[in-house]
């Protein structure tokens, strides 16, 4: 179904079965598969390929040569009906690739809303990218990676399979991330190590003095006390009784499967 208000360039291919909502713009030489749904006011500039079971929300801007929903690079994949889900108001720049999920990984690759994926960024199968995130040029997520809200991943950085990048994290460019990066932390290097807290980013996002003080205290408990995580958790729990923001650290540590960067 193609809404009457949508614009489809004569050179574009929109296969039967695709759902194109109001005021969508499909530019020259785009290819839209039969199981694709594109939300209202989304713009595909030119040479964009959207295939597989892929749902794209509203008000996205997708630039030339982006490939969304194509077959993943997991050698176990055997054509199962897995999918990609993309939210609203994302900017997906030239040559970005977002691959469909696998049945072993929950069947879906998800990208939230209000993200900027810069040129050549790659989101592999079964990844979950939150909202308000930035992936700079050539940043690469391995399969099953989770990137929480407001995280920034620098250019040419690679994130290992199954890693978790916490909320408000900043990973510097040309880094290799092989373990989980706790929320609010700046990470850099190969292998990535912690370089303090993303204080300026937190201030821009409205964190007040009390919250910043609590985050600093939690960081010191985790990284400067000399304690193991199991030993540090009671102190973090006590701190969280006074400062709710510390629960972000505690919740993250419960999720972590690969251990945190050190």
UniProtKB/Swiss-Prot annotation:
Pfam families noted in UniProt: Acetyltransf_11, Hexapep
GO molecular function, one term: acyl-[acyl-carrier-protein]-UDP-N-acetylglucosamine O-acyltransferase activity
Entry EC number(s): 2.3.1.129
UniProt pathway annotation: Glycolipid biosynthesis; lipid IV(A) biosynthesis; lipid IV(A) from (3R)-3-hydroxytetradecanoyl-[acyl-carrier-protein] and UDP-N-acetyl-alpha-D-glucosamine: step 1/6
Transmembrane segments: none
Enzyme class at the top of the EC tree: transferase
An annotated GO cellular component: cytoplasm
Keywords: Acyltransferase, Cytoplasm, Lipid A biosynthesis, Lipid biosynthesis, Lipid metabolism, Repeat, Transferase
Catalysed transformations (reactions): a (3R)-hydroxyacyl-[ACP] + UDP-N-acetyl-alpha-D-glucosamine = a UDP-3-O-[(3R)-3-hydroxyacyl]-N-acetyl-alpha-D-glucosamine + holo-[ACP]
Compartment(s): Cytoplasm
GO biological process, any: lipid A biosynthetic process
Matching PROSITE patterns: HEXAPEP_TRANSFERASES
Record-stated family: Belongs to the transferase hexapeptide repeat family. LpxA subfamily.
Subunit structure of this chain's protein: Homotrimer.
Job description of the protein: Involved in the biosynthesis of lipid A, a phosphorylated glycolipid that anchors the lipopolysaccharide to the outer membrane of the cell.
Name of protein: Acyl-[acyl-carrier-protein]--UDP-N-acetylglucosamine O-acyltransferase
Originating species: Sodalis glossinidius (strain morsitans)
Gene field: lpxA
